[in-house]
Amino acid sequence: MGKFSDLDMYLFGQGTHYDIYQKLGAHLEEQEGVKGVYFAVWAPHAESVSVIGSFNGWREDADVMTRLEPMGIYEVFIPGAREKDLYKFYIETPDGRRLYKADPFAACCELRPGTASVVADIDGYRWSDSRWMERRKKTENIQEQPMAIYEVHPGSWKRHPGREDDGFYSYRELAVSLTEYVKEMGYTHVELMGICEYPFDGSWGYQVTGYYAPTSRYGTPEDFMYFVDYLHRHNIGIILDWVPAHFPKDAHGLADFDGEALYEYADSRKGEHPDWGTKIFDYGKNEVKNFLIGSALLWVEHYHIDGLRVDAVASMLYLDYGKKDGEWVANQYGENKNLEAIEFFRHLNTLIRGRNPGVSMIAEESTAWPMVTGDAKDGGLSFSFKWNMGWMHDFLEYMKLDPYFRKDNHHKMTFAMSYNGSENYILVLSHDEVVHLKCSMLNKMPGLGRDKFDNLKVAYSFMMGHPGKKLLFMGQDIAQLREWSEERELDWFLLEQEEHRWVQETMKELLKIYNKYPCMYQDDNNFNGFEWINANDTEKSIYSFIRKSRTGRRNLLFVCNFTPVERKDYRVGVPLKRQYKLIFNSDDARFGGTGKERPLVYKAEKREWDGREYSIGYELPAYGVAVFAY
């Protein structure tokens, strides 16, 4: 039988068995002419392990596994077991406890509230996204590519009304409907929450029990492959939320897997998250690192995923994250840095990006930790991108203000450019900002009625012009009124009202410009691609800046007015004696403006302004945005 060889054990013990999912778990195979399933599990502290399942009446003595030393791997081949069979591992501990555990390497899981693993063949799907994958492989610098991400919770994007199964769209239904919407709007990527299997809907997928299995809420592993394949065929990239920071204590899960701390740190001061009530992975244990890295590789290489957004990175980097004095243990140098987690990130990111050019590793990191996107050999963590939480906080604080008080907080919208070159940033307005009484994006805006919509449109316009890749959570591009809830679909009926359509049309046009002009994404992380025209018009709360192209042509000039005051002849200094073509005017009727006719071309006049020899004059509406190409 011996599928798990000495070399397999050596590599697993070193933390470098990158195809580990092909060895551990459940695998359909034929031995000596007999078809069945080979099972293998890592449980070094166990006294004995059996496989129980639908094929043996869940009898604990029917299929006892053989222990392989020195790693404590248990294996067995069960004739007659087949695809779609349910199973668990029955573990007896030296002190007599009996544990019933799901398979950590399961390719498929029983639909909640069931907690069994499911035998699945994930090798039979015939992919048809070779053009996308070939192009991905040839992408030399993902930082120079457009990235406008639509963040989606699959279970609450749209639902079928009146069905008993929660009305979830299947992976195959989502593929079609989501692609249609994303293509119409102009997003380049979809970021999916809650794909790795998880038991509790209310965790949104951030308390994972199945690191190798797409959730069964929306279909089978093959259905999920179809979803990825379909989006790729329509030139849409896919990013998954991935959670190596912690895992839940559910009895069937990874916690105390073989009767002792196996996947988590044994010392509760390192192995527990007091705030979240979860366990922390032991990043110093090679087999645990291998488990996590193997999961990441599975999604990227087997499921063709284009990027992983790594959740809660700060909680991994700091030993004292969310903990009081006495609740944490310092490292060998007496510091609060988790040296093992740092090494894990460098290994993970260098490996994934080295084996898979064109794949993005994205950090949700909320502190000022240096060089998150710096190269590992220079002391960085080697992520491709980092969420810019600092920009997001300043931006939202500014937007919530009554326009009268914005002049005293003008710096909040310019500060991010002072550190923009320090990392490769993504500007994010994620699901976290529209839950827990934080209000929807629309209801964060000051004023009443029309004012809220006008504020939101100028906010999105500024965000799209600002350097950095972009992420917007679903529902915010239609000015969702309510906070998001995983228990219901988005309020699509709002699009029956013109104010909501105006916001959607504004976003659609901004995304069109974003994708059309390389100056909007090629030099996001350096000053070659950006220049302030006037960052200091505090009294009027107006910002003007340029997105510069590498060719000197097809540059864009942005002018954004954050007050309800119309500026009849607002003058803007310009860098060159050229004609400036108006390509976006927020006062256009389809965006909810007055529809007033304006010149489409503005010739630079030799009139010094903003420290420049030439300038143009423009009638800037209340909460108005103008974008000029030159």
Language-model region placement:
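Carbohydrate-interacting/catalytic domains
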Residues: 1-146, 171-182, 186, 450-453, ...
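Short, flexible loop/turn elements at secondary-structure junctions
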Residues: 43-45, 69, 80, 153-158, ...
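Glycine-rich, histidine-containing beta strand-loop boundary motifs that form or position
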Residues: 53, 78, 91, 194, ...
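Short catalytic/ligand-binding loop motif for oxyanion handling, primarily in non-cytosolic enzymes
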Residues: 97-99, 158-160, 198-201, 246-250, ...
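Substrate-binding/active-site clefts of carbohydrate-active enzymes
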Residues: 110, 132-144, 153-337, 618
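A short acidic, glycine-rich active-site loop
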Residues: 213-217, 332-339, 448-450, 494-501
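Conserved alpha/beta catalytic core and glycan-binding cleft of carbohydrate-active enzymes
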Residues: 304-306, 324-486, 515-572, 576-587, ...
